[in-house]
Amino acid sequence: MRDAVAESVARALAQPYGMIFARKAQESEGKPPELLTSYECVVRFHAYARTYSRERRPAVRGCLEKTLRAEPDYAEATACLSRVYMDAVRFGWDSGAERDPLGRALALARRSVALAPHSSQCRHALGMALWFSGDVEQGVAALEAGLALNPSDSEIMADLGLRFAVRADWARATDLLEASFARNPAQPGHYHIGLSMAHFAHGRYEAALAEARRARSRDHAFGWICEAVAAARLGLSQDAAAAVGEILALHPDYGARVEDDLAARNVEPGLGRAIVAALRDAGLAAAPQRLPRVV
C-alpha cells in the first residue's frame, strides 16, 4: 500500500504535466529565449505539448535547437525536438522554411535512442516518427518499449492507446486511454479522440460526441472531425455543419483530400470509410469550401 501511494505521489509530481513540470514551466514563462537553460527548454516543450499550440511551436523548436547546439548529446532534448518536427506532419501544419520535417523527426528520434537506449521519452519519439513514416508495426513496438521502460508514463500510454484506436483495436485502445486519464487527469484533451472513435465505431454517438467536444482545438482538426461525424449520425445538422466549418478553417481543402489524409495516418480502412461517409453527411464536400467558425 505504501509503495502504491509513493508511486502515485511521484507520478503526480514528476511526470510531464505533473506538479514539478508545471512549477518549472511557470518559473520560465516570460524569460527571453536566450536566458533559458537547456532544462527549461525541455520543460517548455512539455508545457507546449499540453495543448500543441501552433503559435508556440516555433519558439519551442528554436529553444530546443539552441540547446542542442550547446549540448548535442542531450538525449531528452533531442527526443523533444524530434516530436516538434513530427507535429508539423501529424497536425498538417505548414512547416514553412523547415525542410523534410518527417525525415528530421525520424533522424533525431533515432539519435536520441542511440544516446539513451533506456529512455522512455526517446522511445516515445521514435515510435511517433516511425508511425507517421508508415511503419505501423515498428512504431507500435517502439511505443510499447517506451511504456515497458516507464509503465507510469501516462503520455506514452495515451499515444499508444490512440494508435490502437486508429487501427480499430478497440479493447487495447480503450484500456490504455482510460488508464492514462485515470493516472493523469491533466492529460492533453486531444487524446479524447481515441475514446470518441471507439464510441463512434460501436454506434454510441452521444458518448462519441461528448468525448469529441473535450478534444476541441483551434490548432488541429481531429476533435472537430470526431464531433462532425458523431453529430451527423445523431441528426444534429447544425452542430455537424459547425464542426465542418472548424475543419475547413484549418484546412480549406480537406474535403478533397480526406481519404488520403486518413490513409496517411494509418487509419484502419473500414473505420476510415465510416468516417468519410459521416463527414460527407455532415456537409464536408469534395470541393474546397469555407464555413464560419464557432470558437
Q: Positions of the model-derived regions?
A:
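Acidic, proline/glycine-rich low-complexity intrinsically disordered segments
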Residues: 1-211, 222-227, 231-233
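Charged, solvent-exposed alpha-helical segments that act as regulatory interaction surfaces
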Residues: 14-22, 253, 284, 288
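Residues that form generic nucleotide/phosphate-binding pockets
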Residues: 8, 12, 48, 247, ...
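Acidic, Ser/Thr-rich low-complexity linear motifs
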Residues: 23, 28-29, 93-95, 253-267
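TPR/TPR-like (Sel1-like) alpha-helical repeat modules
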Residues: 216-220, 232-255
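Short amphipathic alpha-helical segments that mediate assembly, nucleic-acid/protein binding
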Residues: 227, 240-244, 272
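Terminal, low-structured helical/coil segments at or just beyond the last alpha-helical repeat
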Residues: 256-295
